Curated annotation (Swiss-Prot):
NDH-1 shuttles electrons from NADH, via FMN and iron-sulfur (Fe-S) centers, to quinones in the respiratory chain. The immediate electron acceptor for the enzyme in this species is believed to be ubiquinone. Couples the redox reaction to proton translocation (for every two electrons transferred, four hydrogen ions are translocated across the cytoplasmic membrane), and thus conserves the redox energy in a proton gradient. Its main location: membrane. Belongs to the complex I 30 kDa subunit family. Keywords: Cell inner membrane, Cell membrane, Membrane, NAD, Quinone, Translocase, Transport, Ubiquinone. It comes from Rhizobium leguminosarum bv. trifolii (strain WSM2304). It comes from the Bacteria. HAMAP family: NDH1_NuoC. GO terms for molecular function: NADH dehydrogenase (ubiquinone) activity; NADH:ubiquinone reductase (non-electrogenic) activity; quinone binding. Its EC number is 7.1.1.-. InterPro entries: NADH_DH_suC (IPR010218), NADH_quin_OxRdtase_su_C/D-like (IPR037232), NADH_UbQ_OxRdtase_30kDa_su (IPR001268), NADH_UbQ_OxRdtase_CS (IPR020396). This is NADH-quinone oxidoreductase subunit C. NDH-1 is composed of 14 different subunits. Subunits NuoB, C, D, E, F, and G constitute the peripheral sector of the complex.
């Protein structure tokens, strides 16, 4: 499998090296890094080229790296049934720079891009219907960003007296506590009772 991917990586470097910023083989998987300007051309080539045949877009997901200037990676997972291999294509972007929509190349990208926008706030230009898909219409923020609070901003519940769903500010019943426990995999620096001989 990795032999076929190594051959594919060298072929892509020769055929469309101008569209690929970086190519990495890690853990038997091939990841191509490109720019937003070259994304659609690369996805189209990967789909249409006879030696590639990546006709299935399996998923699009986001990764948040808050310490980076281009904090988001948009990752496209592709499958070639003809070659029986999978690859990833990555594009880095920030909060304000949109990524071109892949809906024209892979119509199945529609809901994947909506999910990536909903969870991370990554914008896609040319998307036919970019709106929330997993969170509520009035939801504020993007919950998979690393800077999103784990408690959220509002609590949603059904009010039986009002016979409707109500939104209320989050009210924590206790103060925030930090549970900094020792990892069971690291062991102890002290001798546990009854274990005196084990440390000798």
């Amino acid at each position: 499998m990795s032999e076929a991917l190594t051959e594919l990586a060298s072929y892509l470097g020769e055929a469309r090296g101008n569209l690929i910023a970086a190519s990495q083989m890690k853990y038997g998987e091939l990841t191509l890094t490109t720019t937003g300007e070259n994304l659609i051309a690369l996805l189209t080539f990967l789909r249409d080229d006879a030696k590639c045949g990546f006709v299935n877009l399996i998923d699009i997901c986001g990764v948040d790296w808050p310490q980076r200037e281009l904090r988001f990676d948009v990752v496209y997972h592709l499958l070639s049934p003809k070659q029986n291999v999978r690859i990833r294509v990555k594009v880095a972007t920030d909060e304000d720079t949109p990524v071109p929509s892949a809906c024209a190349v892979h119509p199945g990208a529609d809901w994947f891009e909506r999910e990536t926008w909903d969870m991370y706030g990554v914008l896609f230009t040319g998307h036919p219907d970019l709106r929330r898909i997993l969170t509520d219409y009035g939801f504020e923020g993007h919950p998979l960003r690393k800077d999103f609070p784990t408690t959220g901003f509002v609590e949603v519940r059904y009010d039986d007296a009002a016979k409707r769903v109500v939104y209320e500010p989050v009210e924590l019943k206790q103060e925030f506590r930090n549970f900094d426990f020792m990892s069971p995999w690291e062991g102890t620096d002290y001798v546990l009772p009854g274990d005196e001989k084990a440390k000798q």
